[in-house]
């Protein structure tokens, strides 16, 4: 398994994962909304998305959004989204994604 920053060519498979993530939170399936949202994030660079992949298949993702800390007077990243496909759970994917976010 490899964890890396998402790239534009990940748009389609990442959109499917994001749609699954939203369905997990009881939102109706809506691949167009998922694709539009993820496409905007990838194109605008206003979030950092890490993906876990194995043999070319995306297994999960985590998405971080920028914020600022007044106390430390610096930028920080808020982990807002973490999702692992049902078929890839209990295999360390979530842990690897969390580690990538922490290291960022």
Regions inferred by a protein language model and the residue ranges of each:
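A short beta-loop-alpha structural element at the N-terminal edge
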Residues: 2-16
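Conserved GNAT-fold acetyl-CoA-binding loop/helix
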Residues: 15-40
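A short helix-loop-beta-strand connector motif used in the catalytic cores of GNAT acetyltransferases and
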Residues: 39-51, 78
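Conserved beta-strand in the GNAT
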Residues: 51, 57-66
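Glycine-rich acyl-CoA binding loop
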Residues: 52, 90-95
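Conserved donor-binding loop and adjoining core beta-sheet/short helix segment
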Residues: 62-75, 80
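A short, internal acetyl-CoA/4′-phosphopantetheine-binding micro-motif in the GNAT/acyltransferase core
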Residues: 82-89
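Conserved acyl-CoA
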Residues: 85, 96-104
């Amino acid at each position: 398994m490899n964890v890396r920053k998402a790239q534009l060519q990940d748009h389609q498979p990442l959109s499917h994962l994001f749609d699954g993530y939203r369905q997990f939170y009881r939102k109706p399936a809506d691949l167009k909304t998922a694709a539009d949202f993820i496409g905007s994030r990838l194109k605008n660079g206003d979030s950092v998305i890490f993906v876990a992949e194995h043999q070319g298949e995306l297994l999960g993702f985590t998405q971080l959004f920028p914020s600022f800390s007044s106390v430390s007077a610096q930028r920080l990243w808020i982990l807002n989204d973490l999702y692992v496909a049902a078929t890839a759970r209990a295999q360390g994917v979530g842990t690897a994604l969390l580690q990538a976010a922490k290291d960022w």
